[in-house]
């Protein structure tokens, strides 16, 4: 095993995520601005080992990027809506077209009567109406939409629950450190 949790068996890499990687992911997803040295302190590894692990997690697409959470209301986006979109052909590039609309925050292809659920943010109901008429209904194959306005949000975010009990953390750390 190398320092980034990759195992080589008969020359083939088995890209596992060990508990140290999980700890790093848990730390970074809560605070992407945390220093490498602080992560190293928390997981009890050398900063160089942590940096290598983070680079490998990025290269493998497990860490897809870093961003700041901006308060929408401070920029005038006071209305959130969930829109069910029905199309004549589910798929058919519709998801990509919906995702290209700036006000659209999320696009999910779903099973059931509708083809997509999208989350949008607008400044008010008037701008929501314009968005529906001029952008969403203009997308190829859209035949119907059903809009639900969000009254209050209790939880919003993208933090994943990361299970840190998967393997014996201390055993992995000892192997990495050669102790």
Show the residue positions of the predicted features.
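A compositional/biophysical signature of low hydrophobicity enriched in polar/charged and small residues
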Residues: 1-179
């Amino acid at each position: 095993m190398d320092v980034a949790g990759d195992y080589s068996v008969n020359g083939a890499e088995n890209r596992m995520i060990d508990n140290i990687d999980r700890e790093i992911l848990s730390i970074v997803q809560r605070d992407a601005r945390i220093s490498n040295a602080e992560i190293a302190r928390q997981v009890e590894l050398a900063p160089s080992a942590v940096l290598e692990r983070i680079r490998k997690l990025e290269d493998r697409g497990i860490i897809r990027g870093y961003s700041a959470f901006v308060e929408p209301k401070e920029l005038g986006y006071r209305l959130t809506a969930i829109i069910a979109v029905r199309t004549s052909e589910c798929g058919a590039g519709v998801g990509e077209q919906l995702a290209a609309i700036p006000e659209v925050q999320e696009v999910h292809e779903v099973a059931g009567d509708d083809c997509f659920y999208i989350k949008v943010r607008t400044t008010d109901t008037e701008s929501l109406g314009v968005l529906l008429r001029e952008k969403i209904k203009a997308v190829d194959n859209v035949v119907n939409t059903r809009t639900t306005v969000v009254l209050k949000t209790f939880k919003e975010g993208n933090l994943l629950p990361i299970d840190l009990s998967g393997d014996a953390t201390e055993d992995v750390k000892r192997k990495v450190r050669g102790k």
